[in-house]
């Protein structure tokens, strides 16, 4: 620490003028008071951060190092200001105001009072009396009073100096250094001891806080051992991809094989042992320093908060449980076993036999070599700038040569300062020797106090042991009397227990006989109830069985009707193909007849044929047209019939599917009722749960029986209704046939109109012979039309009867069939068929 401390000028004058034992003590006390008074008027550190917080210690320390304002005994102008507490603010201001140039390290603002203070402190301050450490009661009290007024840096330095003294008292007696603040506090405490005739009783050292800090550290170390940090170790060639792990990883066995090839493994082991021991020593020093820093601001006599005490108690119990010997042995065994497993693990990779790894390593080494050759014999100046040594020497000679003169001046000042430091160290050594003598006297007094306290504790221990023994004997006698009373009570209870067991056995026998008789009666009653419930359930399930049989019969009839409809559809398809073939033949005949008419017209004009031959050819043309129209009408009727049958087949298929699903549903209902019957019989109930049946089926068993009776009535009335419908169909059929026979008479109105249209286009000449042929053709065509109408009507009646048997009717509108008819004489018969279908649907 610094020898040039924060003592003000007015205090330095007082210290320099004092001489002698008593006057020196009073002067140091006055300097202490002046320091207290000056610390009261300190201002708070300035705010330099944007968040409104002061600069941290680390930032101030770096700023001091950068600009040469750090407190060091190697410099005479250690602070540069009159007030040591304002040094950090001054350094920060200088760091902010100075420009970053070559001369930025120069001290721009040096207070001349600082040099005066340094010159006065050297020859005038000489310690003749011994100075004690901060272990006495008075020094501790003065430190606790001044604790809130001193800066954190002074407290930390004081704690550090104390720990260093306790750890290395015997080895470093001549190289210790303390600040003036701590020395003044110690002298103020020592003055009281000099004035008093008898040494006061030293207060016992409170190690509780030190132990708490050590326990916390031990707890953190145990936690790190139990839950180690998982770090990613990378081996092999380094790459620029810092985030990605290296693709090559070595096992412990492989690394041991590699390290076995090193020439000097023993030397490395020795170095490792030395390194580990040095680290342990550094850690122990660090822990001691941390403990000192933890307790430096806490007063031993203050009461601890209840919450803090409770937390400490919980931590102690936790550590006592965690750090038991059994837990530690188990943990050590587990760790050793895991380490053995890790050492024996093989990562299935080898270093020198892996060709891919060697190729990758060679490639990476070549790329690194190429990158290095670019900056060979160049120095990295930072920020991506590489300069050769020649350039650096040029720049240095141009920039540093003006500063060499100032450096020489500073060297001379440094030599003078070294001489002053040597003088001060000699004076300090004298004062430290006196301090050590006083410390020895304090230690001897402490030893005497310890012996007296030990003797007093022994006497108190003996008296307390005698009292405890007497109380224990009285307690034993009192407990013996209680045990005798309890033994007599126990014998009485045992006799009562035997009598009670006999009584309970007799009662159990009687109760067992009564329960056996009740069980037999209840079994007979249950069997009778089960038989009655089964009969009742069979009666309830009978309608379901009947309904299932009816549904299966209906399904069978629907399947037969579907087969008949499919056969009728195939027959009609064959007839449609035949009619199409005939129509194509008639079309060919018409084309041939047209060609023939053209030729005949040419011949008639050229040769002048007679009217009779021409009319015969025209009559042939009309007959062919009539036959074609008839075939087209038959084709349209059969196509309509085919469509109707296809619709009926689809309806029957859907009905058959619906009946199949209904049959499955009824079967499931039947199975459900049987299952409920079994459950009820197993439980011993008389009837089925009607509420559950209603939720599952939608009605109760009685409602289901009534509904099945109405369905059976409808099934019985269905055949009579079908017979009436069939009788009405036969009457309608006879009426349609009579109307068609009338329309197919000798006149033949539709065919004659077609003949007239044909004759008007060809010629206006007519004879008796062609008229007779036309009438004959009309008669034949009328008969064929009547036969076709009968077949169509028969097919219509079949479809209507099928619909009546299914209790459903399908309405066919005339508009849906008009586009299939050609408009010849067969149109009237088709319209009559449609009227018959509509009348049948109305009935």
Curated annotation (Swiss-Prot):
<feature type="modified residue" description="Phosphoserine">
    <location>
        <position position="828"/>
    </location>
</feature>
<dbReference type="GO" id="GO:0070941">
    <property type="term" value="P:eisosome assembly"/>
</dbReference>
<keyword id="KW-0597">Phosphoprotein</keyword>
<feature type="compositionally biased region" description="Basic and acidic residues">
    <location>
        <begin position="781"/>
        <end position="797"/>
    </location>
</feature>
<comment type="similarity">
    <text>Belongs to the EIS1 family.</text>
</comment>
<feature type="modified residue" description="Phosphoserine">
    <location>
        <position position="88"/>
    </location>
</feature>
<feature type="modified residue" description="Phosphoserine">
    <location>
        <position position="763"/>
    </location>
</feature>
<feature type="compositionally biased region" description="Polar residues">
    <location>
        <begin position="798"/>
        <end position="810"/>
    </location>
</feature>
<keyword id="KW-0007">Acetylation</keyword>
<dbReference type="InterPro" id="IPR024527">
    <property type="entry name" value="Eisosome1"/>
</dbReference>
<comment type="function">
    <text>Required for normal formation of eisosomes, large cytoplasmic protein assemblies that localize to specialized domains on plasma membrane and mark the site of endocytosis.</text>
</comment>
<feature type="compositionally biased region" description="Low complexity">
    <location>
        <begin position="752"/>
        <end position="764"/>
    </location>
</feature>
<protein>
    <recommendedName>
        <fullName>Eisosome protein 1</fullName>
    </recommendedName>
</protein>
<keyword id="KW-0472">Membrane</keyword>
<feature type="modified residue" description="Phosphoserine">
    <location>
        <position position="775"/>
    </location>
</feature>
<feature type="modified residue" description="Phosphoserine">
    <location>
        <position position="710"/>
    </location>
</feature>
<dbReference type="GO" id="GO:0032126">
    <property type="term" value="C:eisosome"/>
</dbReference>
<dbReference type="GO" id="GO:0005737">
    <property type="term" value="C:cytoplasm"/>
</dbReference>
<dbReference type="GO" id="GO:0005886">
    <property type="term" value="C:plasma membrane"/>
</dbReference>
<feature type="compositionally biased region" description="Polar residues">
    <location>
        <begin position="127"/>
        <end position="137"/>
    </location>
</feature>
<dbReference type="GO" id="GO:0005739">
    <property type="term" value="C:mitochondrion"/>
</dbReference>
<feature type="modified residue" description="Phosphoserine">
    <location>
        <position position="829"/>
    </location>
</feature>
<feature type="modified residue" description="Phosphoserine">
    <location>
        <position position="2"/>
    </location>
</feature>
<feature type="modified residue" description="Phosphoserine">
    <location>
        <position position="838"/>
    </location>
</feature>
<dbReference type="GO" id="GO:0071944">
    <property type="term" value="C:cell periphery"/>
</dbReference>
<feature type="compositionally biased region" description="Basic residues">
    <location>
        <begin position="33"/>
        <end position="46"/>
    </location>
</feature>
<feature type="modified residue" description="Phosphoserine">
    <location>
        <position position="584"/>
    </location>
</feature>
<feature type="modified residue" description="Phosphoserine">
    <location>
        <position position="816"/>
    </location>
</feature>
<feature type="modified residue" description="Phosphoserine">
    <location>
        <position position="130"/>
    </location>
</feature>
<dbReference type="Pfam" id="PF12757">
    <property type="entry name" value="Eisosome1"/>
</dbReference>
<feature type="modified residue" description="Phosphoserine">
    <location>
        <position position="401"/>
    </location>
</feature>
<feature type="region of interest" description="Disordered">
    <location>
        <begin position="120"/>
        <end position="174"/>
    </location>
</feature>
<feature type="region of interest" description="Disordered">
    <location>
        <begin position="717"/>
        <end position="843"/>
    </location>
</feature>
<feature type="modified residue" description="Phosphoserine">
    <location>
        <position position="182"/>
    </location>
</feature>
<feature type="modified residue" description="N-acetylserine">
    <location>
        <position position="2"/>
    </location>
</feature>
<keyword id="KW-1003">Cell membrane</keyword>
<feature type="region of interest" description="Disordered">
    <location>
        <begin position="1"/>
        <end position="53"/>
    </location>
</feature>
<feature type="compositionally biased region" description="Polar residues">
    <location>
        <begin position="163"/>
        <end position="174"/>
    </location>
</feature>
<feature type="modified residue" description="Phosphothreonine">
    <location>
        <position position="720"/>
    </location>
</feature>
